[in-house]
Amino acid sequence: MGSQEVLGHAARLASSGLLLQVLFRLITFVLNAFILRFLSKEIVGVVNVRLTLLYSTTLFLAREAFRRACLSGGTQRDWSQTLNLLWLTVPLGVFWSLFLGWIWLQLLEVPDPNVVPHYATGVVLFGLSAVVELLGEPFWVLAQAHMFVKLKVIAESLSVILKSVLTAFLVLWLPHWGLYIFSLAQLFYTTVLVLCYVIYFTKLLGSPESTKLQTLPVSRITDLLPNITRNGAFINWKEAKLTWSFFKQSFLKQILTEGERYVMTFLNVLNFGDQGVYDIVNNLGSLVARLIFQPIEESFYIFFAKVLERGKDATLQKQEDVAVAAAVLESLLKLALLAGLTITVFGFAYSQLALDIYGGTMLSSGSGPVLLRSYCLYVLLLAINGVTECFTFAAMSKEEVDRYNFVMLALSSSFLVLSYLLTRWCGSVGFILANCFNMGIRITQSLCFIHRYYRRSPHRPLAGLHLSPVLLGTFALSGGVTAVSEVFLCCEQGWPARLAHIAVGAFCLGATLGTAFLTETKLIHFLRTQLGVPRRTDKMT
């Protein structure tokens, strides 16, 4: 497969399923906005930070390493032993949920029962929901290994929507239930998620005419249950040792992913109300990153990994592939920079309005607007880092990856310390500032690698980080106009003034996008020829 074909495949992969995800996200966005108007920020903080951290930590400790080990090395293996190994996640999950549940109940600060009722029940049910989700782990890994991509999207999206609907119903009709509401909804979510996989494989394996059965290593649903293999070995010990190696390495990822919640939970730098507001703003701010930047990053990592030879100098590779990779990297950097700048510039003037529409005065009257404005800057760094790291990780040699992991280890430690110090100094904004510092270091590392990689070639993909002076001036003018508009029109003067503020923003956004269309012709050509390629209708795979 040539580099242009790989590029076309990566572009289609980046857009496949995106519409479905946007639809599901939009539904849950509306439901969550409705739910927030009936809750206190203390309950939101306990659920979204404290209890969700218990759930995610249990799942991480019980399954993360198993997933990475069992998805390594392709599909050619003794799947009976692999499935047996995956079933060990269930007793591990029981152990970790009991151990962590004891810590959550006995060692951490317990919320005021008058403000957040039924905390102990919430801890028990969130731990139980993690164990229930682990019951579907063998099905999930089998689906991932055989590229049943849309099954994952539909199962997770359906589960989230039904969870949000149940939560909204209980909050509206039984608000006095407190944490019972979210605990039951979480348990319902994991049950539906597991049932989606079980029902799908039951129907698939019960249909002999299905073409997918030819690629699956099992023929009956009972083959997915634990059993002794033909050679008498219950598990593959090589996979088991690999699992242990991944378990040790995965702590770095967990610290970077959930570091803020660990600092909040164990160091008590914020009260439960501030934790709730921070988590809502964090989820709202990261929505664009999850919907747009993450699919692009994942898909074009595959492109770079297939086109370039890992650890080999650019001058020693096929020059056509190197040129295509450089052109794509330049366009992706430009796209990330433009998207990030747009969010940053317009986010400053519309953060308070967005939070007021989404969650009412609970979000828009306190620290929420400052948090979201700060997060808009962080989104710009997230966008650039996603592109630079997807190239860097695809082109680095194993030794370079090991050195990079060492830097990441130092960054994770500094992030925790910096988060603690900055939150003591400036409150919850300190978490975002610490993330910006962390992301800035990672971007610098990746940019240095890209510069060295193309140093002896005629290609300069980092030119994608340069914008025309006219476009930069348009961004600056738009930022100034919308800032003035916010002062005079938002957000205490009623909906006519708000609509006028929105109209000003729409005009400025149109002018900015029009200027970008006229000045960034190379990027427009890339978007038209690659991301705009017509696609066949995909079947569920």
Swiss-Prot record:
Membrane topology: Multi-pass membrane protein
InterPro entries the record matches: RFT1 (IPR007594)
Organism the protein comes from: Homo sapiens (Human)
Keyword Membrane: yes
TM annotation in the entry: 16-36, 42-62, 85-105, 123-143, 155-174, 187-207, 335-355, 376-396, 404-423, 428-450, 470-490, 499-519
GO annotations of cellular component type: endoplasmic reticulum membrane
Disease: Congenital disorder of glycosylation 1N: A form of congenital disorder of glycosylation, a multisystem disorder caused by a defect in glycoprotein biosynthesis and characterized by under-glycosylated serum glycoproteins. Congenital disorders of glycosylation result in a wide variety of clinical features, such as defects in the nervous system development, psychomotor retardation, dysmorphic features, hypotonia, coagulation disorders, and immunodeficiency.
Source organism, top-level taxon: Eukaryota
PANTHER family: ENDOPLASMIC RETICULUM MULTISPAN TRANSMEMBRANE PROTEIN-RELATED, PROTEIN RFT1 HOMOLOG
Function: Intramembrane glycolipid transporter that operates in the biosynthetic pathway of dolichol-linked oligosaccharides, the glycan precursors employed in protein asparagine (N)-glycosylation. The sequential addition of sugars to dolichol pyrophosphate produces dolichol-linked oligosaccharides containing fourteen sugars, including two GlcNAcs, nine mannoses and three glucoses. Once assembled, the oligosaccharide is transferred from the lipid to nascent proteins by oligosaccharyltransferases.
UniProt keyword terms in alphabetical order: Congenital disorder of glycosylation, Disease variant, Endoplasmic reticulum, Membrane, Sugar transport, Transmembrane, Transmembrane helix, Transport
Predominant location category: endoplasmic reticulum
GO terms of biological process kind: dolichol-linked oligosaccharide biosynthetic process; glycolipid translocation; protein N-linked glycosylation
Subcellular location: Endoplasmic reticulum membrane
GO terms of molecular function: glycolipid floppase activity
Pathway the protein contributes to: Protein modification; protein glycosylation
Family according to the record: Belongs to the RFT1 family.
Keyword NADP tagged: no
Name the record gives this protein: Man(5)GlcNAc(2)-PP-dolichol translocation protein RFT1
